[in-house]
Structure formats: structure tokens, C-alpha cells
């Protein structure tokens, strides 16, 4: 997960980010869900795509983990910012399980319209919030082959909602809802980033030089890893 790090001076490689609407750096961390440790950290320039170089970071982390524990099972989770071909490709090359968010497009909406209508009708008829799932093989134009997509359709008092993930988890073919829930648990990683940024003040990157700020970020992260 990345997190925004607003800047207020003339730090090197800070740029305006359209989504966050501020000048910033964009740190990105790979966090282990088993122990909350930060395994890999980088400091992206302010307007970078969050997935920039993430495939290389992932390859390095997986290689180091397998050097220590050859039989370790690795499952990658990331939001739709990391749902890009490079991340699918490297995960499949490394033979690890992955579940990555995917932005809804016209085709996915078409495939899930009837399920969303069913969820809405059930909610309106019972007053009970509805949460339904569908899954199917899907191939985007930029993909070399089909991949398994799970779509969640919700209807409740707040309205309707659709979310999609791409996954190669074996259980997703039988229990797509469980696969989606395992993905949704990645929200805890966002909490770890909040602790790193707020509690450990990892956003204190006020030096003019990029590499000095990168070193500061490493120190903040080392302190965080000592505490978890």
C-alpha cells in the first residue's frame, strides 16, 4: 500500500498529485499480514503511479523469503492501484497466490447488472442488507490470457455498491465470497500505514535532498518494526 506524504518546501522529486490535490512524496510499503512488519519500502516521486516498480519490489521480497523458507506460501493482496498487468505477470511467474483489486468497467458492469438488481430487490423486499457474489473467467485487452474475476454486489440503506478483484486463489473458484473477504482484510495494512505515518511520524520528510528523505523514511520504518 502507498500513503501520501504532503510536502511544503522545495524537496527534490515532489510533485503535485491530482488525486490527493497536494504536492507530496508517495511512500509505498509491502507489509506482512502475519506479523505487521514492513518487508519492503520505497519512496516514489509525488505524482508516480502507486504500482511503479512494485513488481520488482515483490520479486525481491519473494526471493529473499524463499531463500530463508523455501516452502513458504505467499499470498499477495493489493488494491486496484496494483491491479496492473505487470503485477499479474510477476505473481504468476513467481507462482504465488494473488488477489488484486480491479476497477469496474462497462463489461464488468454488464456482467454483474442482474446480480446487482437481485441484491437491490431483496433489500427493498426485506430491509436486510444484501451482499451477493459472482465470478467468471475474464480477459482484458492487455492480458495474454483469461483470469478469474470475483465481483461483489451490495445493497443496503446507503445504496448499492460493486467491487471487483482478480485472483488465482484456488478457493476462489468454489467460494468467491470467501476469496473476496480474504482480500478485504487487507484494510489492516492501511492501518499499519496510518500508524507508520501518524504514530512514527514517517511523513517528516522535510530535507531538500531526496536521498536524505529516503534515509529518514528507513529510520522511521526501522523504529516501527522494532515496536510491532
Show which residues each predicted segment covers.
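Short amphipathic alpha-helical "interface-anchor" segments enriched in bulky aromatics
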Residues: 176-215, 219, 223-228
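Active-site beta-loop-alpha junctions of metal-dependent nucleic acid enzymes
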Residues: 43-67
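Active-site-proximal, Lys/Arg-enriched surface segment
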Residues: 2-29
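An anionic, glycine-rich sequence signature occurring as long contiguous blocks
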Residues: 97-198
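Short, surface-exposed basic-aromatic patches at helix termini and helix-loop junctions that form
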Residues: 88-97
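Active-site beta-loop-alpha junctions enriched in small/polar residues
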Residues: 2-5, 44-46, 81-83, 103-105
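Gly-rich Lys/Arg/Thr-decorated short loops/hinges at beta-loop-alpha junctions or inter-strand turns
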Residues: 34-46
Amino acid at each position: 500500500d502507498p500513503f501520501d506524504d504532503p510536502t511544503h518546501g522545495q524537496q527534490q522529486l515532489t510533485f503535485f498529485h491530482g488525486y490527493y490535490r497536494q504536492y507530496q512524496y508517495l511512500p509505498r510499503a509491502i507489509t506482512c499480514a502475519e506479523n505487521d512488519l514492513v518487508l519492503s519500502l520505497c519512496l516514489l516521486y509525488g505524482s508516480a503511479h502507486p504500482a511503479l516498480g512494485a513488481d520488482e519490489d515483490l520479486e525481491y521480497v519473494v526471493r529473499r523469503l524463499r531463500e530463508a523458507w523455501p516452502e513458504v506460501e505467499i499470498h499477495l493482496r493489493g488494491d486496484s492501484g496494483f491491479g496492473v498487468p505487470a503485477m499479474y505477470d510477476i505473481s504468476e511467474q513467481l507462482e504465488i497466490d494473488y488477489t488484486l483489486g480491479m476497477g469496474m468497467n462497462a463489461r464488468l458492469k454488464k456482467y454483474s447488472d442482474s446480480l446487482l438488481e437481485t441484491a437491490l430487490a431483496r433489500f427493498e423486499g426485506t430491509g436486510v442488507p444484501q451482499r451477493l457474489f459472482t465470478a467468471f473467467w475474464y480477459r482484458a485487452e492487455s492480458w495474454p490470457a483469461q483470469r478469474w474475476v470475483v465481483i461483489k454486489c451490495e445493497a443496503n440503506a446507503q445504496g448499492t455498491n460493486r467491487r471487483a478483484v482478480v485472483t488465482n486463489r484456488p478457493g476462489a473458484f468454489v467460494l468467491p465470497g470467501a476469496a473476496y473477504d480474504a482480500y478485504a482484510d487487507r484494510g489492516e495494512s492501511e492501518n499499519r500505514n496510518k500508524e507508520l505515518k501518524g504514530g512514527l511520524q514517517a511523513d517528516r520528510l522535510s530535507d531538500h535532498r531526496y536521498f536524505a528523505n529516503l534515509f529518514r523514511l528507513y529510520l522511521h520504518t526501522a523504529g516501527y518494526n522494532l515496536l510491532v
